[in-house]
């Protein structure tokens, strides 16, 4: 964990008012202006985390067929389907992931017996910095309290909040990453971690991680394993998910024509959930908790 503090030039009251204005801003230019002012005048204490190459994250696609190409596992999304989201502006391509498969399943609409889904494991191919706005601690410093107020924006539910959070995310991962003063301390910010809207515990595992287009397109993170899963048991408080087939990027997993290769056989060394294996999930509030460790990112 690295805390990046900016020398504060405004009074605490002035900063608090700026954050309040930011939480109400409904214009992209105004959001960017307020963010830039807060950054250059010392507005908040940033919680940054360094993750190593090899870190893995999950992405689930709620569609029944296996998936044929990498794009079928959420990246790059077709621009015509890129409506405004919590961390992307309309038409903007980003990669949404989660450290926890249970979080991905929790955000699906239903878990009925026979439901088939695609699950991809995305693996970082280089080290990267992640801005964490999912932590909810009791801040002590004034700059920490201001940062906490900024975090609260990512807890709000409803499309009308997305204008602010999508612009804020793009600003942190885009414009700010090109800031010379920032790059003197670290090599840009490639990802942002924010709380799942369905989180009912304080665990950071119930969070999502979004990656900027530049990092993904440059090969900073790639699809390394792909799964075809099926719900074999489902109830109000528990469910069981089984691997029907999977593939590996490192084992001739992509054919010459760019199609993914699937296997139902025993080649499972390195697989998080081998073929035929099952994982039971128990519900805690709105969150599905696996009965075995599946987290690959911490």
Task: Provide a role label for each language-model segment.
Residues 63, 99-100:
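Beta-hairpin (beta-strand-turn-beta-strand) motif
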Residues 91-97:
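A short, exposed loop/beta-hairpin motif centered on an aromatic-Gly-Thr core
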Residues 101-112:
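Short active-site loop/helix that positions an aromatic residue
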Residues 85-86, 94, 109:
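N-terminal accessory/assembly segment that mediates macromolecular interactions
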Residues 82-83, 89, 101-102:
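DNA-binding interface regions
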Residues 2-53, 59-79, 88, 111-298:
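Active-site and NAD+-binding cores of ADP-ribose-processing enzymes
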């Amino acid at each position: 964990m690295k805390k990046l503090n900016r020398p504060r030039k405004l009074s605490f009251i002035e900063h608090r008012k700026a954050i309040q204005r930011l939480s109400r801003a409904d214009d992209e230019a105004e959001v960017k202006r307020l963010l830039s002012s807060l950054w250059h005048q010392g507005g908040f204490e940033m919680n940054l985390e360094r993750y190593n190459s090899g870190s893995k994250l999950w992405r689930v696609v709620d569609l029944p067929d296996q998936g044929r190409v990498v794009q079928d596992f959420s990246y790059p999304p077709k621009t015509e389907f890129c409506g405004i989201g919590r961390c992307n502006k309309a038409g903007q391509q980003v990669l949404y992931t989660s450290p926890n498969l249970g979080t991905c399943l929790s955000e699906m609409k239903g878990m009925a017996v026979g439901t088939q889904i695609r699950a991809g494991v995305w693996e970082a191919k280089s080290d990267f910095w992640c801005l964490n706005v999912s932590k909810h601690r009791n801040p002590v410093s004034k700059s920490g309290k201001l940062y906490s107020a900024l975090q609260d924006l990512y807890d709000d539910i409803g499309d009308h909040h997305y204008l602010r959070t999508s612009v804020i995310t793009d600003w942190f991962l885009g414009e700010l990453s090109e800031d010379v003063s920032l790059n003197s301390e670290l090599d840009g910010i490639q990802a942002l971690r924010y709380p799942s809207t369905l989180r009912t515990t304080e665990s950071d595992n119930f969070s999502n991680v979004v990656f900027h287009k530049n990092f993904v397109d440059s090969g900073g993170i790639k699809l390394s394993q792909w799964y075809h899963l099926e719900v074999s048991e489902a109830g109000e408080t528990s469910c069981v998910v089984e691997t029907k087939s999977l593939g590996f990027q490192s084992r001739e997993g992509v054919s010459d024509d760019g199609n993914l290769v699937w296997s139902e056989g025993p080649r499972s060394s390195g697989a998080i959930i081998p073929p035929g294996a099952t994982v039971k999930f128990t519900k805690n509030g709105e969150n599905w908790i696996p009965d075995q460790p599946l987290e690959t990112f911490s």
